């Protein structure tokens, strides 16, 4: 909203955290939603999003190379699991999609749409914000995700969530 709306919400003690989320790449078929075929996500048709999409594609490729260098066994398994995925549905070389969450906390869930055996790469940018940590109850652990960090995690395997994000200064954020 505008400055007046923000001031009103602040005086009322309401949440002032701006949140955005978008999925890049492809979507799996969802026959129950009258979409029996895979498709590219709608953001790809938005001219203003093209620079963002290219930047995310580049970040994806760079992260894949880090996985290849540090954990070649994970990289090779991921490549094998994606052998049957057509190139047109891939985002990078070993994923079908990428999600960008700006100040988004997530309730507990399991990524049931992921291919069993795969890993997710979570790249985090943050500034003047607390929270936004990955909580995995099965491991009794919460992963603090520092600025410029990368976490590799099999999100299909366990229930997990993201803790609330609280800016500690004006324009504070957490993006992953």
For the regions a protein language model found, what residue spans apply to each?
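Fe(II)/2-oxoglutarate oxygenase catalytic core
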Residues: 1-118, 126, 142-143, 160-176
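Generic hydrophobic secondary-structure signal
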Residues: 100, 125, 134, 150-153
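Conserved metal-binding segment of the jelly-roll/cupin
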Residues: 123, 143-158
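A short beta-strand-loop-beta hairpin characteristic of the jelly-roll/cupin
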Residues: 124-146
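Short coil/turn segments at secondary-structure boundaries
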Residues: 134-138, 147-149, 156, 163-167
